[in-house]
Amino acid sequence: MKPSGIGGQAVLEGIMMKNKSQYSVAVRRPDGEIEVKTDEYVGIAGDKAWAKLPLIRGMVNFIDSMILGMKTLSWSASFYEDEEEEAKPGKFEKFLLKLFGEKAEKVVMGATVAFSVIMAVLIFMLLPYFLSGLFRKFIVSNTLLAIVEGCIRMGIFILYVALISSMKDIRRTYMYHGAEHKCINCIERGRALSVRNVRKSSRYHARCGTSFLFIVMVISIIFFIFIRVESPVARVIVRVLLVPVIAGVAYEFIRLAGRSNNIVMRILSLPGKGMQMLTTKEPDDDMIEVAIAAVEAVFDWRAFQGLKEEEPLDMPKLESGQTDVPEPEELDEIKIEDL
């Protein structure tokens, strides 16, 4: 499997795809038509060399993905807002426009991302620490306490994902998430990008954000087993300060998993892919069409696969010496070749 380097995320009734600094958003409008927007996003650090260093690039990319995600989600939601609500800005919006002028949108975006990061740290890093403290009377070993803390952290994360997946709107978003993964898998496995080929591709992918967050949880257990401080206040501070480091390590793991095809990385990636059973669902053909439109707006998959324009879309690309068309993959289970 050849890595394409593209990635994306689901938005409201659509998909965002990013290829280097170029990104596209494809949305299924209420009238049934597909609206596609393309633009450039250079990132918070631009082309600075330090932002590309191992560990540092993980946190930078995480923040960039949140900013771009908020921006594209807002754009997709605009197609489903009431005309009256869209036409009349509220008092708070008027206040921000008066205070910050043209930079108001960027200020709101930055504040939203900052608030999201703070809430994530509180819920997934500090809350498990305080809850694990309830076991200090019964558990003397700091190693066991760190493991208990990690288990609580993963439990909160899994419960959160499971709860929101039961919401109707979120379920449709997860279906678009599945369509995004299917398109990338279709391309990277050498198949022409068509509805038929995308439909039979796997909805699980090693470079998924769900896998990244799960790996963050696992790595945090390892870190807190070996990094110990006596003061309770210092423990809280250490957990906050280590968030960028843990995120950086998790990013490097996901990056390696996305580029490597050896059995060890496949096995290590399995738990994260298992989490994708909650955050991805099988899309319908309309959703797949939206995903294809998003991909083709920023990525030349034909050039990537070395295909000619006249080659038929629905014929899978055969490997050298292969004469039979491969059987379709199973849709609802994770197979070894999907790892």
What is the meaning of each model-derived region?
Residues M1, G5, A10-V11, G46-K52, ...:
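Cytosolic juxtamembrane amphipathic/interface segments immediately preceding
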Residues V108-F124, H205-V216:
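Select subsegments of transmembrane alpha-helices in polytopic membrane proteins
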Residues A26-V27, E35-K37, N61, S65-K98, ...:
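Short, charged cytosolic
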Residues K2-G7, V11, I15-M17, I139, ...:
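Polar-ligand-bearing catalytic/cofactor-coordination segments
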Residues E105, M109, V113, L145-R153, ...:
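Residue-level signature of transmembrane alpha-helical entry/exit and packing/kink sites
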Residues W75-F79, S116-S141, V216-V240, P244-A247, ...:
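Juxtamembrane "helix exit" motif at the C-terminal ends of alpha-helical transmembrane segments
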